């Protein structure tokens, strides 16, 4: 069934700037996985599994391919189309006590509402490079947020 999802969409010209690590980049000496870092929340399936965090935001995908990272619990389920931040995702960032947020769609940009609303230190994967720990200033997050464009995305759910 098709559903209209209100979102803030990432313009194409923003994609390059946000693909650059937005914090401290950690790379393992052998270019393998990085383990054991601490942050308030992790965005991404592999990162969520390998680091110590209070909250996990996952979508059962890595590099756009479905992955099985073991049994997962979902305190909150959100719908978030690729390249967007849905209003549903913003609402989920306000929920206290949630330890696991499962995303139908893509979780990549959800770093933004969780750092803005909760001031979280976030850890996320930098594909084929390493792991980034980010705790940007509120001003930096608001600047990124202002660049997103309101839109409606039709998603088959």
Curated annotation (Swiss-Prot):
Which leading EC class covers this enzyme? transferase
User: Could you mention a single GO BP entry for this protein?
Assistant: coenzyme A biosynthetic process
Alphabetic keyword roster = Coenzyme A biosynthesis, GTP-binding, Kinase, Nucleotide-binding, Transferase
Enumerate the catalysed reactions.
3'-dephospho-CoA + GTP = GDP + CoA + H(+)
- Enzyme Commission code(s) on record: 2.7.1.237
Q: Mind telling me which Pfam families this protein's record contains? A: DUF359
**InterPro entries per the record?**
GTP-dep_dephospho-CoA_kin (IPR007164)
The residues that hold GTP are 40, 59, 61, 107, 128
Protein's UniProt keywords contain GTP-binding: yes
Give GO terms: molecular function aspect only.
Answer: GTP binding; kinase activity
Pathway it belongs to? Cofactor biosynthesis; coenzyme A biosynthesis
Q: What's this chain's function?
A: Catalyzes the GTP-dependent phosphorylation of the 3'-hydroxyl group of dephosphocoenzyme A to form coenzyme A (CoA).
Q: Which HAMAP family match?
A: Dephospho_CoA_kinase_GTP_dep
Q: Which family does it belong to?
A: Belongs to the GTP-dependent DPCK family.
Q: What is the protein name for this chain?
A: GTP-dependent dephospho-CoA kinase
